[in-house]
Amino acid sequence: MTNIFTPIEEALEAYKNGEFLIVMDDEDRENEGDLIMAAELITQEKMAFLVRYSSGYVCVPLSEERANQLELPPMLANRSDRHGTAYTITCDFAEGTTTGISAHDRALTTRSLANPNSKPQDFIKPGHILPLRAVPGLLKKRRGHTEAAVQLSTLAGLQPAGVICELVRDEDGLMMRLDDCIQFGKKHGIKIININQLVEYISK
């Protein structure tokens, strides 16, 4: 089964070029595949694709430093998510958006969260994008999709921000598992990696 996964160097080239990656979690964790790409490179068309084939619960993982710069506090003082996902207050970019929910608006908000020139006052809270705080140390400390997205962006030499959403099956709306993700990747020409590969890559 190992040959279904793309080598990390090849995946990073695709990521730098604004392509999606399918990133598989550990089987004993969530065992799901997320579509992930660099936040700064998301377009309206890419966002529409992401929403169409996913749960639609679009999240933007940020480094802790970036989340602090934008003054994005935790959604709850004591988080209760069973996997320890660090949700912050939701937001929309203020300028150039309307309702905040369209593919255009969500792509603009996502790019703006990645933009180092954006300031806290540039965002309306609450909104339609869910920023996530990656833990310091990224995958060396927590093996989640949040950290994987920021790790990929960092390795690619991009801003420490990604955009992610869980892939779901058309027929029943359940999460895609590995076999589903393999078929989806083949159909749409999207490379697949897993978090274990990334951990091994950064440990070299």
Curated annotation (Swiss-Prot):
Record bears the keyword Cell cycle: no
Binding site for Mg(2+) 2: E30, H145
One Pfam family this sequence matches: DHBP_synthase
UniProt cofactor note: Binds 2 divalent metal cations per subunit. Magnesium or manganese.
PTM field: S-glutathionylation is reversible and dependent on a glutaredoxin.
Catalyzed reaction equations: D-ribulose 5-phosphate = (2S)-2-hydroxy-3-oxobutyl phosphate + formate + H(+)
Molecular functions (GO terms): 3,4-dihydroxy-2-butanone-4-phosphate synthase activity; metal ion binding
Keywords on record: Glutathionylation, Lyase, Magnesium, Manganese, Metal-binding, Riboflavin biosynthesis
Top EC class for this record: lyase
NCBIfam families in the record: ribB (TIGR00506)
Protein name: 3,4-dihydroxy-2-butanone 4-phosphate synthase
Gene assigned in the entry: RIB3
